Structure formats: C-alpha cells, structure tokens
C-alpha cells in the first residue's frame, strides 16, 4: 500500500525524503523519543498502529519493539503546522530509549526549570 496521497501532499521532506517523528506518551504528554520517518514508515504506522521508523544508519525500516519487545502502540498521529514533523501519541511498553531508560530525554538537563 501507499500513503494516502492527500497526506503525502502535505508532508515536507528533507533531501533524503525523510521527516521528523516525535513519540509522545499518551496520558503524561512526556516526549519519549525523536526518530525519522519516510512515507512508507508513516503508512505502515497508520495501518498497523505499531510505530515504524526509518533508520538512517542501517538504511532500513524498523518497528519499535520488534526485537526488544518495547513496543509503541500508536493512538493518534498529528502533522505540525509546517508539515515537516509528525507527532505520534503512543502507549509505550517498556523503555523507549535504546539505553534502557523510559525516555531519550532524561540524560542531560541543559537548562533547569526556574525555581
């Protein structure tokens, strides 16, 4: 199958045909991770509700949790105002980060909240 042409026409891709995907935890709103998608990954994600991404390093599609069991069930997909980023609202099973942490954004605080 191919991505719905109406959706595809709204996407702005980089030179490699990719766009940013942000995975946000359903319920908490916490950002879990950022990855890349292409049209095929978005189509697969929308058809299966299993988050599918594009690996730039491996040059292939991957389904989150396919090997680790740490899956992302996708509840909704939203396109940002510029058309270059999608927001996936997901139910995360296990850690989202490859380091074993719940989110990829808990390593270094560059600017702490004001007290």
Curated annotation (Swiss-Prot):
Keywords: Amino-acid biosynthesis, Cytoplasm, Histidine biosynthesis, Hydrolase, Magnesium, Metal-binding, Zinc
Binding site for Mg(2+): 80, 82, 84
Pfam families for the chain: PRA-CH
Pathway: Amino-acid biosynthesis; L-histidine biosynthesis; L-histidine from 5-phospho-alpha-D-ribose 1-diphosphate: step 3/9
Cofactor(s) for this UniProt protein: Mg(2+); Zn(2+)
SUPFAM superfamilies: HisI-like (SSF141734)
Reactions the enzyme catalyzes: 1-(5-phospho-beta-D-ribosyl)-5'-AMP + H2O = 1-(5-phospho-beta-D-ribosyl)-5-[(5-phospho-beta-D-ribosylamino)methylideneamino]imidazole-4-carboxamide
CC cofactor note: Binds 1 Mg(2+) ion per subunit. Binds 1 zinc ion per subunit.
InterPro entries hit by this protein: PRA-CH, PRib_AMP_CycHydrolase_dom, PRib_AMP_CycHydrolase_sf
GO cellular component, one term: cytoplasm
GO biological process terms on file: L-histidine biosynthetic process
GO molecular function: magnesium ion binding; phosphoribosyl-AMP cyclohydrolase activity; zinc ion binding
EC id: 3.5.4.19
Similarity comment: Belongs to the PRA-CH family.
Function noted in UniProt: Catalyzes the hydrolysis of the adenine ring of phosphoribosyl-AMP.
The protein's name in its UniProt record: Phosphoribosyl-AMP cyclohydrolase
Lineage, highest ranks first: Bacteria, Bacillati, Actinomycetota, Actinomycetes, Mycobacteriales
